[in-house]
Amino acid sequence: MSRGLGDVYKRQIIIRAIAIAPDHIPSDIITHSYIFDNVNNDLPVVSIAIAPDDLWDPEIGMHVTGDAFWPFYPYYGSNFWNDWEKEVHIELFEPGGIIGFKQNLGMKIFGGWSRAEAQKSFSFFARSMYGDGDIDYELFPGSGVNNYETFILRAHGQDTVMFRDGFQTSLASDNNVIVQDYRPAVVYLNGEFWGIQNIR
């Protein structure tokens, strides 16, 4: 019996593995993202791994309208208006491919009417039920803050310029007011390119 070379992957892929044996407790699930085409090395990459049904299933999927919704914008009653939280695995890669952090978190759809847009914002929650109760990482380099319980990946909603919100809040940062930090990132959802969103 000889070994073959296996499959050749030329695009992003997420590998999830678990060890199972009769009469033994299964291992933890191990997840790792392989990002091959990060052409913009100036931005961090956020890879989100989630069970597909938790996104797309008409009954339990949080990213879809579902079966009972108002047929006019912003589609009230759609699944994405529910306050559902689903378990995900997040990996943040700094420019150059260096892993920043990887962790299981809770994820919700975030925002107001932007929930009805194709690219939705997500909020993430570190909870002990998923593993660690906080994220020990400096999400915003130079901020001096390296411990978070939650953060947002904010889509651009109706802002087609895609950086207006972050830019405007950064203008106030030197005026002794509290503002949200802003960091654009390339996002992959289950290995699919999902656009550029802002870490907030």
Can you say where each PLM-predicted feature lies in the sequence?
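Conserved ATP-binding subdomain of kinase catalytic cores across diverse folds
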Residues: I20, I48, G66-R200
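Low-complexity, Pro/Ser/Thr- and charge-rich linker/hinge segments at domain boundaries
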Residues: S33-P58, A116
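C-terminal, active-site-flanking charged/polar segments
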Residues: R11, F36-N40, R200
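Short, small-residue-biased leader/transition segments that mark boundaries at the very start
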Residues: M1-Y9
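Intrinsically disordered, low-complexity segments enriched in small residues
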Residues: I14, I18-A19, N40
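Short, exposed coil/turn segments at beta-strand boundaries within extracellular/luminal domains
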Residues: D23-I29
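Exposed beta-strand face motif in extracellular beta-rich ectodomains
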Residues: R11-I15, K86
